[in-house]
């Protein structure tokens, strides 16, 4: 996966250990992929996909802590965190606007790191599209609804190319936790290259 993707979102509030995260960072660095922080609500039981009523100041500090820990591991391989992409329920909370979104934006401002979100977010520095997630309008279909995840590599590639054509989409996401994630990622990258796109990291 690391040789297919040009940027790697490293989750650390929702799963994993310092050792597994260090291994992920090492693999991404070896492949030449950009490294982004993928902070979440502190929700290991729900893999960061359960909404939390975390107070804004506490949430800001949680994000600062998670990104800071990842950056320390990046320094160990001569790299740095290059952007922040919130994970799961935190991502959706930010897209809804409000105080939790302000808290994450404040953390990104203090860290002087860009925020990667869906392009309609007022806090997005860079906009992203999702190749293997179904949309309802401009938002992602909730994962608990039928058809929320696109498993067909050809359909994911087709959607990735359509999303890339939008002026405000700078990068295409493929989740790495699906059973056929590598096959889908290969198809999406091949589709983009066939369509004439120069596939490289949006923060390189």
Explain the meaning of each model-derived region.
Residues 44-78, 83:
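Glycine/small-residue-rich loop that forms an oxyanion/phosphate-binding "nest" at active or ligand-binding sites
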Residues 185-204:
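C-terminal domain-boundary segment and adjacent tail
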Residues 9-14, 93-96, 109-120:
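Catalytic beta/alpha-barrel core
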Residues 38, 84, 174:
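Conserved, mostly hydrophobic/aromatic
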């Amino acid at each position: 996966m690391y040789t297919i993707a040009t940027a790697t979102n490293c989750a650390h509030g929702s799963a994993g250990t310092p050792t597994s995260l260090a291994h992920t960072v090492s693999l991404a660095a070896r492949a030449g992929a950009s490294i982004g922080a993928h902070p979440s609500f502190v929700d290991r039981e729900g893999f960061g996909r359960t909404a939390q009523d975390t107070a804004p100041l506490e949430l800001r500090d949680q994000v600062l802590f998670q990104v800071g820990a990842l950056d320390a591991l990046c320094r160990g391989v001569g790299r740095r965190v290059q952007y922040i992409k919130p994970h799961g329920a935190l991502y959706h909370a930010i897209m809804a606007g409000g105080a939790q979104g302000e808290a994450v934006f404040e953390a990104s401002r203090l860290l002087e790191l860009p925020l990667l979100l869906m392009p309609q977010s007022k806090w997005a520095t860079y906009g992203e599209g999702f190749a293997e997630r179904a949309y309802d309008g401009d938002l992602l279909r909730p994962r608990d609804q039928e058809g929320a995840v696109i498993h067909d590599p050809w359909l994911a590639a087709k959607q990735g190319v359509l999303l890339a054509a939008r002026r405000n989409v700078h990068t295409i996401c493929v989740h790495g936790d699906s059973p056929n994630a590598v096959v889908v990622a290969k198809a999406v990258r091949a589709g983009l290259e066939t369509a004439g796109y120069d596939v490289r990291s949006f923060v390189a």
